[in-house]
Amino acid sequence: MYIEMIDETNQVSEEIKNQTLDILEFAAQKTGKEDKEMAVTFVTNERSHELNLKYRDTNRPTDVISLEYKPESSLSFDEEDLADDPDLAEVLTEFDAYIGELFISVDKAREQAQEYGHSFEREMGFLAVHGFLHINGYDHYTPQEEKEMFSLQEEILDAYGLKR
């Protein structure tokens, strides 16, 4: 999995960046998404607040914002088109590989780690996996969705070694 990582806060250690890359690659392997691409940006509460207002119409910061990439194009190409134009096939494959981006609030992660009584490392890993599952179509609006998503989330975190 290819992951672009940006630290807008300049507060995230190399260890946390490496853990984030590692746990996302682990989650991708567990969910069969190894060939996908995504972006992760570490932000402040102020930036999280702006993004939450813009994308979710919620006037407060949040821990992780997950923006799932959904191609808006309804273009379709048959196999002959793709065979005639290998560049087109490559571009479409790249678009198909990109699944979305996460914005993780470093401030919120610190607050929540303290509130929940576990490490900052565990909270950052949790937020990365939680966001990853969201951009892969998982949600928790209904009890059944919540059970499915949270079960997989804990399975990934436990298998990786970030148990509660």
UniProtKB/Swiss-Prot annotation:
Lineage: superkingdom: Bacteria
Molecular-function GO term, any one: metalloendopeptidase activity
Disulfide bonds: none
Nucleotidyltransferase listed as a keyword: no
Location of the protein in the cell: Cytoplasm
GO CC, any one term: cytoplasm
Cofactor: Zn(2+)
Keyword annotations of the record: Cytoplasm, Endonuclease, Hydrolase, Metal-binding, Nuclease, Ribosome biogenesis, rRNA processing, Zinc
Coiled-coil stretches: none
UniProt binding sites for Zn(2+): H130, H134, H140
Pfam families assigned to the protein according to its UniProt record, in alphabetical order: YbeY
A single BP term in Gene Ontology: rRNA processing
Comment on bound cofactor: Binds 1 zinc ion.
NCBIfam families to which the protein is assigned, alphabetical: rRNA maturation RNase YbeY
Role this protein plays: Single strand-specific metallo-endoribonuclease involved in late-stage 70S ribosome quality control and in maturation of the 3' terminus of the 16S rRNA.
Family according to the record: Belongs to the endoribonuclease YbeY family.
Protein's name according to its UniProt entry: Endoribonuclease YbeY
Organism listed in the record: Streptococcus mutans serotype c (strain ATCC 700610 / UA159)
